[in-house]
């Protein structure tokens, strides 16, 4: 059964709708909803919750907070269903958006906590960047979980928000920090509703970029971003994400290059080479590396190829290789050694190389 209810009369539409999908979130909801109540934004605000077949006390907690929020002037729309199984994050977000009224959408996950300034600061930024997804910096809980990832999302430059969209880290501003206009969401969306195992945020982000959307980050830590084993992120298969990433690279970058070098003659570089279409593989002029053993080997032979003779790709020292590069070396892992090597070549990110690690 689908239900949607709103006790307040909708005489005036909200300026900002907070979009909150919920599935069995009882242990985090109080803190999450308290953070909605504590927003210092002075415009009309609405909370749109979609309860995706929760079997715990989530529904009762939402009902309790509905009263508190409406008493403080925040209207609340509750939708949901009580089918035996959940329909997934993409479906829930689409439903929460559809039942909401705000001109702007502020996405929130039920296990995260907003800082009081979040809606206000992102709303201001969205007014200046109407076709962008607005993100923000985050604080991780627990603090020592995913340190490299957290550093990456908090410190990308404004250019890198667009050039580093091919890495395994996914969207350069993370989904629970997204804020955008409803008009732009409708132009790009909706989210993929394939359910468990579908990286719906990544697919939406790619579609947003295809349509010429920008990416902007408010440089304040406006979200407490929780890491735990129940997170929906963990249900997405690495291979699924890999396939989408390779396809996006082949669509967005490789058509502009006549030839290129894959930086990393090891496992990741070879995996990328094998994952490319034949047309893209033919553009690979070399692998490059710093590992003397790999370089001494001289070449990589693609054994699984149907071609005769089988393709042999030279392996060079990075200083002897030709740009542009697709870089398959993980960032922030080699104590700065890789970053120094890359810097020594004086290349421009996005034009002379992209990161695909």
From Swiss-Prot:
Keywords: Cytoplasm, Glycosyltransferase, Transferase. Its main location: cytoplasm. It holds the Pfam family Glycos_transf_2. CDD domains: beta3GnTL1_like (cd06913). Its EC number is 2.4.1.-. It is found in: Cytoplasm. One of its GO terms (molecular function) is tRNA-queuosine(34) galactosyltransferase activity. It is an enzyme of class 2 (transferase). SUPFAM superfamilies: Nucleotide-diphospho-sugar transferases. GO terms for cellular component: cytoplasm. It catalyses: queuosine(34) in tRNA(Tyr) + UDP-alpha-D-galactose = O-5''-beta-D-galactosylqueuosine(34) in tRNA(Tyr) + UDP + H(+). It comes from the Eukaryota. GO terms for biological process: regulation of translation; tRNA modification. Belongs to the glycosyltransferase 2 family. Glycosyltransferase that specifically catalyzes galactosylation of cytoplasmic tRNA(Tyr) modified with queuosine at position 34 (queuosine(34)). Galactosylates the cyclopentene hydroxyl group of queuosine(34) in tRNA(Tyr) to form galactosyl-queuosine(34). Mannosylation of queuosine(34) in tRNA(Tyr) is required to slow-down elongation at cognate codons UAC and suppress stop codon readthrough, thereby regulating protein translation. This is Queuosine-tRNA galactosyltransferase. The gene is B3gntl1.
